[in-house]
Amino acid sequence: MALDGLSNQTFQEIDVAVVGPAGDQGRQVTEDRGFRYIDDRGSRNRADACNVAIEETESELVFFTDDDVIVPQDWVEKLERWFQRPEVSGVGGPNFAPVDESNIWQKSIDVAFCNKFLTAGTNYGRMSEGTLEEVEQLPGVNSAYRREVLEEVGGFDRGAIGAEDVMLDHRIRLLGHRLWSDGSATMWHRRRGVSRVRKQIRNYGLVRTLAGKRYPRLWGWSHGLVSAFPVLVCFSLATFIWGCLNGGLAWPSFWDISTETVP
């Protein structure tokens, strides 16, 4: 569990807060470890729950992760050190599926999720070039920000049903602040099964489209290409069937590589 890793951090000066429903059994688990449990005030999405956490805490730095991760012991230490630089408003790192706890399907899903060409440019599996690399977006499961910056932008977009980290980072950068990635600060993030991933991808496509409508500058050529993928698949299938019904490519000279036909 995430709480186990947070209980054994090399950086000791941390306050761990878990946000959830008032009657959730997670309260007992959280408090048994000496951590603080915060009522989510009826939040229906991650964005609103994160805003509750920001309002109910006072630390200079705010770290975000999820409940389905394995937190390395030096996670906080690796990210916290960069805030000594004034140009760092937020910093994060890559997230990968834990090798020893993932089946072949989850490993395959991890490869897809960590490839920027298959995810319209996201950097969830991006290994920074050099010690620290400036980026446009931080993974919500592995990120830290200065509180003053979060308060300046007004926190996460209230009511956002997804892509809340994308929109937050976009607004932070619009104000001239800079975000960075430390490729060594890896978070081990458990991947879902195939059936749940299908639903996750469908939902992500929806929320990313909504985010693009709210902030048009978030919509890039890569998102248009991904949106066109179903059309391209249907077109390819139709042309394949048409070719089969019509005897395939009837260009014998095209396929003939004998010396008589090659100039």
Q: What residues fall within each predicted segment?
A:
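Short aromatic/hydrophobic "clamp" motif used to bind/position activated sugar donors
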Residues: 62
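Catalytic donor/gating beta->alpha subdomain of glycosyltransferases that bind UDP-sugars
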Residues: 99, 157-219
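Short, acidic, metal-binding catalytic loop of nucleotide-sugar glycosyltransferases
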Residues: 4-13
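The conserved acidic donor/metal-binding loop of glycosyltransferases
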Residues: 66-70
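Conserved donor NDP-sugar-binding/catalytic core segment of glycosyltransferases
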Residues: 74-107, 111
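Membrane-embedded multi-pass helical conduit in multi-pass membrane proteins
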Residues: 229-263
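A recurrent flexible, glycine/aromatic-enriched loop bordering the glycosyltransferase active site
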Residues: 115, 119-144, 161, 167, ...
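Glycine-rich, basic loop-to-helix element that forms the pyrophosphate-binding segment
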Residues: 40-57, 129, 133
